[in-house]
């Protein structure tokens, strides 16, 4: 289900920081519980893709919400706690490396987005999705916004929740798989990570065998 509202943001005139204008436009049209949806982890060689959906309370929006990539780790963690305390609803979903390999990263990301919107404790009346694509079978109408985390505070909040959640998951994985430095690069294709892969090979269930440079070099024998 998709929907386009009248006053889409100007993608060539990004605000200095995300704001609540998209949400206010939708509320004027009768959509009150608006979920911002974002993902983290499309590109890494290891770990899950994580998505989050956040419905903010318009009267209690945390100060300083921004694209998670523009915030320090400390500030992300602070805002993570503030969002969980003040938001009307927060939902998180993830899909593992093996599921990504069996499908593809785009399909896995959209499915995780669908799951997190569906999993909100308060049903969303509308969803603002970061990116170009709208997941199939959402329980509400939706609009995809390119660079949405730079337009919408709801999407920015979702990006922070997803980023902090995934980083923590990868740091935990780093305590188990100590040879890969996961707590530092959280699965991305850094030089240190690629060197570790050359030396130790990938971990079944952790690494994405369908991604270069693993594809064609290694085989998931449990698939």
UniProtKB/Swiss-Prot annotation:
Residue sites binding a divalent metal cation per the record: 38-39, 130
GO cellular component terms, A-Z: cytoplasm; ribonuclease H2 complex
Catalytically driven reaction(s): Endonucleolytic cleavage to 5'-phosphomonoester
Tagged with keyword rRNA processing: no
Source taxon at top rank: Bacteria
GO molecular function: manganese ion binding; RNA binding; RNA-DNA hybrid ribonuclease activity
Keywords from the UniProt entry: Cytoplasm, Endonuclease, Hydrolase, Manganese, Metal-binding, Nuclease
Domain (RNase H type-2) ranges: 32-223
Subcellular location: Cytoplasm
InterPro entries per record: RNase_HII (IPR022898), RNase_HII/HIII (IPR001352), RNase_HII/HIII_dom (IPR024567), RNaseH-like_sf (IPR012337), RNaseH_sf (IPR036397)
PANTHER family reported for this sequence: RIBONUCLEASE H2 SUBUNIT A, RIBONUCLEASE HII
Described purpose of this protein according to its UniProt entry: Endonuclease that specifically degrades the RNA of RNA-DNA hybrids.
Name this polypeptide is given: Ribonuclease HII
Originating organism: Bartonella quintana (strain Toulouse) (Rochalimaea quintana)
Gene: rnhB
């Amino acid at each position: 289900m998709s929907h386009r509202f009248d006053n889409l943001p100007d993608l060539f005139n990004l605000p200095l920081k995300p704001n609540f204008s998209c949400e206010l436009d939708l509320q004027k049209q009768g959509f009150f519980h608006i979920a911002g949806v974002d993902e983290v982890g499309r590109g890494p060689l290891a770990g899950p893709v994580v998505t989050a959906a956040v419905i903010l309370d318009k009267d209690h929006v945390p100060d300083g919400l921004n694209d998670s990539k523009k915030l320090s780790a400390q500030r992300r963690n602070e805002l993570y706690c503030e969002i969980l305390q003040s938001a009307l609803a927060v939902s998180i979903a993830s899909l593992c490396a093996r599921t990504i390999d069996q499908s593809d990263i785009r399909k896995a990301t959209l499915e995780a987005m669908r799951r997190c919107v569906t999993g909100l404790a308060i049903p969303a009346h509308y969803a603002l999705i970061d990116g170009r694509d709208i997941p199939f079978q959402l329980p509400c109408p939706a609009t995809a916004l390119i660079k949405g985390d730079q337009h919408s505070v709801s999407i920015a909040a979702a990006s922070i929740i997803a980023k902090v959640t995934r980083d923590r998951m990868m740091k935990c994985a780093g305590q188990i798989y100590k040879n890969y430095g996961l707590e530092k690069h959280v699965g991305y294709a850094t030089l240190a990570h690629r060197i570790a892969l050359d030396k130790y090979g990938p971990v079944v269930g952790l690494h994405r065998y369908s991604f270069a440079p693993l594809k064609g070099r290694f085989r998931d024998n449990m698939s």
